[in-house]
Amino acid sequence: MTKTLVFGHKNPDTDTICSAISYAELKKAQGADIEAVRLGELNSETTFVLDYFQATAPRLVQTVANEVSEVALVDHNERQQSANDIDEVTVTAVVDHHRIANFETSDPLYYRAEPVGCTTTILLKMFRENEVEISKTVAGLMLSAIISDTLLFQSPTCTEEDKVAAEKLAVIADVDIQTYGMEMLKAGADVSKKTVAELLLDAKEFNMNGNKVEIAQINVVDVNDVLNRRSEVEALMTQNVVDKGLDLYLFVITNILTNDSIGISIGSKTSVVEEAYGIKFVENQAPLKGVVSRKKQVVPILTDTFAK
């Protein structure tokens, strides 16, 4: 039997890690030889989740082609967000809830993408469709992913399907959604001990009409916890622009209590962000009123504006 590695995107978040673990558990129950791995360091929220449900973190890998010939992707499909040597392996399956871009294969594959708030919402359906029982630990991880990606159902990405899935998983995991959810989000929003690099850890790269764009996001309970370190943040952002040849680096600082964000923009295409939102950056900073979702409120809007 051919071994498969399953993983989410670089700079992994809670959905990416928990989806990889959950997908692997589903496939193992069906007899597959599969291992969940990760492409980057864990953030504080994900660490809290794994500790809470006593789950083991997936193994960190730098490349995959040196280990296997087949992989499965969760929570992403765009090649620049995936393993560096993704073109050297065969992608046999994708389970995702994002746009499809910069992705093609030579052979047919299992591809499941749905416009829901979280990958594990889709995975819950797959467990049920295949009549595979979900353990308390895996249910807790899947629930945590939904809470994380939907900001406890406050994000515009959240659907009724996500809410129903969360309720079902909470019963199995034996937790109160609101109590656990706030505890989890606050653990992830504590930036007091984070390095500048860790503040920018949740970053994704996109190709927008030939422009190289990176968008980072962090959730906080007080934006000043990040803005007080703005000079350090901007210095690292500027270095990333130079090192990666970025046209735009946008950092979205989201207040999970007010559901608003502050944007910091570095790069030659900052004017595109200004046009997209009708704002003006002053010293690289501007308010993003009501913006909490990179997937739904940032990426599509910037993609459309770059295409003009």
Swiss-Prot record:
Keyword Metal-binding annotated: yes
Keywords: Cytoplasm, Hydrolase, Manganese, Metal-binding
InterPro entries in the cross-refs: DDH_dom, DHH_sf, DHHA2, DHHA2_dom_sf, Mn-dep_inorganic_PyrPase
One term of GO molecular function: manganese ion binding
Chief site of localization: cytoplasm
GO cellular component terms attached to this protein's record: cytoplasm
EC number: 3.6.1.1
Subcellular location: Cytoplasm
Catalytic activity: diphosphate + H2O = 2 phosphate + H(+)
Highest taxon of source: Bacteria
Pfam (any one): DHH
Record: residues binding Mn(2+) 2: D15, D75, H97, D149
Cofactor binding remark: Binds 2 manganese ions per subunit.
Annotated residues for binding of Mn(2+) 1: H9, D13, D75
Listed HAMAP family: PPase_C
Name this protein carries in UniProt: Probable manganese-dependent inorganic pyrophosphatase
Natural source organism: Listeria welshimeri serovar 6b (strain ATCC 35897 / DSM 20650 / CCUG 15529 / CIP 8149 / NCTC 11857 / SLCC 5334 / V8)
Upper classification of the organism: Bacteria, Bacillati, Bacillota, Bacilli, Bacillales
